[in-house]
Amino acid sequence: MRVVLGPMEGVLDHLMRQILTEINDYDLCVTEFVRVIDQVLPDHVFHRLCPELMQGSQTTSGVPVHVQLLGQEPHWMAENAIRAAELGARGIDLNFGCPAKMVNKSKGGAALLQHPELIHSVVKACRDAVPANIPVSAKIRLGWENPEDCFEIVDAIQSAGANELTVHARTKQGGYKASEIKWEYINKIRERFSIPLIANGEIWNFEDGQRCIETTGVDSLMVCRGAFNIPNLGNMVKHNHTPMVWSDVVDLLIYYSKFEMKGDKGLYYPNRVKQWFAYLRQSYPEANELFREIRTFNKAAPIVEHIQRYRDELQSRQSQVA
């Protein structure tokens, strides 16, 4: 089985990739999207979103990182794919699945699912532009509204020469509703097409992963949101590990405080750790108590101080029980 840590715009940056690949056996990571409009972006944009380019396009633990591009103009997508490759990208991933309204309004992401011919043009332009040894992949949803549209979309991508395709098994209109997941369509795609597939959507534990593999016939899986709910989800899905216990999550939150973004004026950790709590609270009820203590702070120092104090009290309670 292969497990990929998927992209999450505004959430899964290089620091989170570093942390999550240190504690999980992921096979691949994909960056947040590089938004392409009508120019070749300056190098600092690629390095900001993928600083791993300066260390062999891999995380510090050695997991390959592919650069994700989002746009609808074939020429400029290809030109930026070339630049990413020149900067050392191990792979180029094309985003045709982002459901965000602002992205779709500007004709990016999932909006292109309504235009398979344009998807074909973008993929072909990028595939023709970069060296053959650099894979060009794509990520889609099943369609804008009708999942039956997936076959025309996949045909457009495969015929354009893409090396791999991730399928999020919901339509754009299906959002993130569990009831809208349609893994069976990935199986239908696998039966009709030869392009290698990665299955994505509603994989929250080992059992989900196994059911997805059984339903789709695909043994490459991508996890995204769940990786923030339970930090060791990659190992749960791949190796049937038990969920990380809450005390270890607290240690991870403290470890996260050691990272800081250059030039962010000390706001990185407070903003991102609160964002992380929004996910943790869905899987760890204990997170609610700790979040209430830190939510009004906007500096890293008092947040870390409170988390450390909470950890010490937690360890004290655990030792008394033992």
From Swiss-Prot:
Enzyme Commission number(s) from the entry: 1.3.1.-
The reaction(s) this protein catalyses: 5,6-dihydrouridine(16) in tRNA + NADP(+) = uridine(16) in tRNA + NADPH + H(+); 5,6-dihydrouridine(16) in tRNA + NAD(+) = uridine(16) in tRNA + NADH + H(+)
Keywords: Flavoprotein, FMN, NADP, Oxidoreductase, RNA-binding, tRNA processing, tRNA-binding
Top-level taxon of origin: Bacteria
Molecular functions per Gene Ontology: flavin adenine dinucleotide binding; FMN binding; tRNA binding; tRNA-dihydrouridine16 synthase activity
Cofactor: FMN
Site features described as Interacts with tRNA, chain residue numbers: 35, 95, 176, 272, 274, 279, 295
Active site: 98 (proton donor)
Gene3D superfamilies recorded: Aldolase class I, Dihydrouridine synthase, C-terminal recognition domain
Positions with a binding annotation for FMN: 7-9, 68, 139, 200-202, 224-225
CDD domains recorded: DUS_like_FMN
A Pfam family of this chain: Dus
tRNA-binding is among the record's keywords: yes
UniProt keyword annotation of Signal present: no
Classification via HAMAP family: DusC_subfam (MF_02043)
Function: Catalyzes the synthesis of 5,6-dihydrouridine (D), a modified base found in the D-loop of most tRNAs, via the reduction of the C5-C6 double bond in target uridines. Specifically modifies U16 in tRNAs.
Family: Belongs to the Dus family. DusC subfamily.
Protein name in UniProt: tRNA-dihydrouridine(16) synthase
